[in-house]
Swiss-Prot record:
GO biological process assignments: regulation of DNA-templated transcription; response to nickel cation
Native source organism of the sequence: Methanosarcina acetivorans (strain ATCC 35395 / DSM 2834 / JCM 12185 / C2A)
InterPro entries, sorted: Acetolactate_synth/TF_NikR_C (IPR027271), ACT-like_dom_sf (IPR045865), Arc_rbn_hlx_hlx (IPR013321), CopG (IPR002145), CopG/NikR_regulator (IPR050192), Ni_resp_reg_NikR (IPR022988), Ribbon_hlx_hlx (IPR010985), TF_NikR_Ni-bd_C (IPR014864)
The protein's role, per its UniProt record: Transcriptional regulator.
Family per record: Belongs to the transcriptional regulatory CopG/NikR family.
Identification of the protein by name: Putative nickel-responsive regulator 3
Listed cofactors: Ni(2+)
Alphabetic keyword roster: DNA-binding, Metal-binding, Nickel, Transcription, Transcription regulation
Pfam families per record: NikR_C (PF08753), RHH_1 (PF01402)
Presence of keyword Mitochondrion: no
Amino acid sequence: METELMRIGVSLPDTLLSKFDEIIEKRGYSSRSEGIRDAIRSYISYYEWMGDIKGHRVGTVAVIYDHTKRGLSNALADIQHHYSHLIKSSVHIHLDHDNCFEVIVLDGDGEEIKELAEAIMALKGVKFSKLTTVASNEKI
């Protein structure tokens, strides 16, 4: 059960807010606040799932970032070199003049994979990142 509501302020780019407003309208939320609460719950759930990544895993990190952000491309390369023992392959796609999409295929210890993903997520200029893994011994 949730406790009393707290009022907060958030600064967002116009384009992000416009897209969010479209989604909350399509989903039938009664207000932006309800949409934001739902988004935060989803983020918390994903973060808790990430905390449970243990054992041998295979997976991907998908990243969209602004390559014009000073030092970002080098920081991404440094992280990938640091965790090169986990990386099996990567694909780099130029989305437009400023934005790149990268998919990194991983195989190794779940804790280290999580560390790599969190290091990328923390970089300024990363617009989107998503870690997806599966235990390598799961039967499909």
